[in-house]
Amino acid sequence: NETIFQGDKIELAIKGFEGIKWMENISCIFIIGILIYMLYVVNTKFSSEIGNVFSGIKGTWGMPFWAATTSFLGIYSTMIINASDYSRNATDDIKPVKATSIYTVAILPVTLFMGLIGLLVTAATGNSDPVEVFSTTMGSKFLTILTLLFIAFAQVTTNVLNNIVPPAYVLMESFKVKWTHATILVGVLSACVMPWKLVTADSAAGLSLFTQFYSAFLGPIFAVMAVDFFILRKKKLDLNDMYDKEGCFKGINWAAVIAIIVGSVCSVFVMQLSWYVSLIPTGVVYYFLMKTMKSSKGFRKGTIFED
């Protein structure tokens, strides 16, 4: 089954963004519809159990909550940082407000639905795997088939866009390979990692720690990008300069590298909140290094520090 899924995802990615776009558009409606139905089934079948469990639970805004949001941001920050991999294919002039609205509508409903369903199912049955609950305990073949379809669509839509496209671009840039060869290589390498083992109950704690760990690096990268774009460049970019290999962006901006290292080191001390902890130190260090480092002089073109 995993081999078939992997082959389908690679084939879809090879066809390029036009095929991915239509697959995503169709699947998102289907997935939201299934999630709404799942929520309805859980609420009607386990309403008394859910009420009994939650009646004695006090909510918390403490470390468990913020650690969970760190894991969430760690997963989605890869997509945030690589948003240009997708937006570069947009042919229409989409304003920031419209783009933000599209991202919000596309991500939040599905994410909240899945989190809510997982929470309710765990509270009612003690099993934290909604897929297993729906496919084995509901006693409905229709619901089992629906659950399996949901898994298939969710895997394909998430993995193709988030996990194949960004590394494929990296391979293309680093080794000068074609898009087709890059996507096939990413697909083969991702299968070698055996991600289906990472989501088992035995691996849950380790996976969460791994997510928090790489958030210690993705948070600083995001901070550098945000400070550079919103504060230093006042949301104005010269695309000709960015794509000119002999232009002002030639070489390595050591101010950014040092800032990312500083932010990563700071976040390691509070691993559960790594993404949040890294933002301010990274942003502050990057701002002052861009202002003072001689080696960053060429990168100041178009910023508030330009001579």
Question: What do these predicted regions represent?
Answer:
Residues 1, 88-93, 127, 160-187, ...:
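Helix-loop-helix connectors at the membrane interface of multi-pass transporters/channels
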Residues 5-42, 101-106, 210-214, 276-284:
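Membrane-interface loop-to-helix entry segments
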Residues 29-55, 73-77, 118-124, 223-236, ...:
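Hydrophobic alpha-helical segments and their helix-loop junctions in multi-pass secondary transporters
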Residues 6-27, 85-91, 160-163, 169-174, ...:
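Membrane-water interface regions at transmembrane-helix termini and the short interhelical loops
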Residues 1-15, 29-39, 68-83, 108-109, ...:
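Transmembrane alpha-helical segments of multi-pass small-molecule transport proteins
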Residues 1-4, 17-27, 130-143, 173-185, ...:
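Transmembrane helix-loop boundary segments of multi-pass membrane transporters
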Residues 39-44, 55-117, 141-161, 218, ...:
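Hydrophobic, membrane-embedded alpha-helices of multi-pass small-molecule transporters
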Residues 221-285, 296-307:
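C-terminal membrane-solvent junction of multi-pass transporters and transport-like membrane proteins
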